[in-house]
Amino acid sequence: MKYKEINFFKGHPSSRLLPREAVIQATAAILGPETREYDNDPYNRHPLTYGSDEGALWVREQICTFLNDQLFKFENGARSRTRADYLNLNSGASYGMLNILLQTTLPHNGYTRQAFIITPTYFLINNCFTDAGFKGKMTAINEQGHDSIDFESLISALEQHEAEPQPHSTTEMIQGPKLTKKVYRYVMYCIPTFANPSGNTYSLETRRRLIDIARKYDMLIITDDVYDILDYTTPSDELPSPPLRMVHIDRSTAPSGEDSFGNTVSNATFSKLIAPGLRFGYHESINANLARQLSKGGANVSGGTPSQLNSMIVGEMLRSGAAQRCIAHLRSVYSERATVLTSALKKYMPLGTEIMPLKGGYFTWITLPPAYNAMEISTILAKKFNVILADGSNFEVIGDEKNWGQSCFRLSISFLEVDDIDRGIELFGAVCKSHAITNNITM
């Protein structure tokens, strides 16, 4: 018997959720007129020509309105509020991540000493760090509980690197003739809200403590703020109020001064909120300094902002409210899927399975009881029933593995419909039961 593929690995939306008509309407609004009032404005430019380095000003202003007034609801005059010059537009979080590493770190000569990555981690982030020169210089830091990290291990590792003899290294090899770049001694990568893969959300105390540590050790914290708006704990017909992003906390508490660059950068995208094919996102820093630096890399200076047209399509969708309606629809659909997945896991999985609450984002993380072998179960499930799971071995920090593949799985709700979710977990549970019988595991 041939089974239909049920794929819990895919971390992108079902095709039916892609807002084709809304994108068509926004594109027509941008390109329909023969001219636009900003076509010859150097800060904006024609949508089909090279953009400015930091991206169209009106789009950045629209994102600021979305963040300040609609989402986080900052009061006028609050230090947390963002401004257009604090943003650098880019072509999505993946490109944004690599650009940050290339423009703010220098592992090649030892100036940037180490990268710290929260584990389990988004598996493809390893490639960005490797491309940026961090192979052999990545340390995994465990999460603790549902809202914190292993601070003891982080501080111990930092102190160890501080105590080691350091090569005489400068940042000269990364500096250009017109802009003095801020280069950090350490870098950290994390997803503070509805993390991929664990689903965890850091407490305010955890966020503040991380920033304090970053300031002490000259560390840049790169936060993937890509899931925090996909909150399923509040009504889907109104925008949620996410936890403060770490860049907001850093901005509101940072010492004032023109030479400040801060210790955080928000790496955000509209891929999870509208459609990944648009390839559009933005960096947000505490002030204009780091945002400007990120906009002055060689590729940006050569070709301008990498998503000039698509940034304006998204800007128009934000202006018209179409983007907000897309978000509401996604939250409604994903919330239902999250409920079905949680119910199915409780119904079909072995007694003692640890299930992380799926309160937002795409993923939940489950841990089977001792003696079960996650990699073996996922292999059997794929071969026998065509159910594709991502066992924990996919979410390691390369070079500092924690054996997540022994007992853990990440499950995604973004791609599958509710019937497939329930059926897939039923088959998952059946294979676990068979595995237990074969291996004499007490159920």
UniProtKB/Swiss-Prot annotation:
CDD domains: AAT_like. InterPro entries: Aminotransferase_I/II_large, PyrdxlP-dep_Trfase, PyrdxlP-dep_Trfase_major, PyrdxlP-dep_Trfase_small. It comes from the Eukaryota. Coiled coil: none annotated. GO terms for molecular function: 2-aminoadipate transaminase activity; pyridoxal phosphate binding. One of its GO terms (biological process) is biosynthetic process. It holds the Pfam family Aminotran_1_2. Present with 1390 molecules/cell in log phase SD medium. This is Uncharacterized protein YER152C.
